[in-house]
Amino acid sequence: MRYSDALELIAHKRSLLDRIPVGSILLPTHAEFDRMTTKHRTDADRLSRAIELAERLDCYIILRGTYTAICLPSGLALFDISGNRGLYSMGCRNVLVGVIAGLIGQGYESVSAATLGVHLCGLAAKLHAGRHSERTLTASQLIDQLGSAYRQLEAH
């Protein structure tokens, strides 16, 4: 099952939301999030609902946007400003899911994996844009920049 298929199942049967394991990390598109919950008129409404839902479900919800929001089970949200619009290219969300899963596999806690994963992908997108253009970013090019992004973080 693909990640987006699981979110679509939740959208069609909202009672599945309550079966999401504690500490899970959800990364829906805005449209998927609206289908999982309700249609939101503004980004602020969507963010508010995501924060409430993350707290209720004791999970993490990542909403990508100009500033990517990482909604925490504590009822707070962290914002990452490292990315660019190139991250909306086909497959880039799958790269982010893979990076976060890889970090969890390395022993990172969910909150650290989510924040580091979002920041690494954002930094990789900026590195690509510095050499090319943010509009030309593909998922494979994002992957190609991850090593450089990680090294840059380690240097600081």
What are these regions (language model features)?
Residues 1-82, 153-155:
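Glycine-rich phosphate/dinucleotide-binding loop and adjoining beta-alpha-beta core of small-molecule
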Residues 3, 94, 113:
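Hydrophobic, well-ordered secondary-structure elements that form the walls
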Residues 38-48, 107-112, 133-137:
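Short, charged, surface-exposed loops that flank catalytic or proteolytic processing sites
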Residues 48-51, 78, 97-98, 111, ...:
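Feature representing long, continuous alpha-helical segments
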Residues 84-100, 110, 135:
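Short glycine/threonine-rich catalytic loop with a Thr-x-Gly-x-Asp
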Residues 96-104, 117, 121, 142, ...:
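Buried hydrophobic packing segments
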Residues 104-117, 126-131:
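Phosphate-handling active-site elements
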Residues 123-156:
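Charged C-terminal helix
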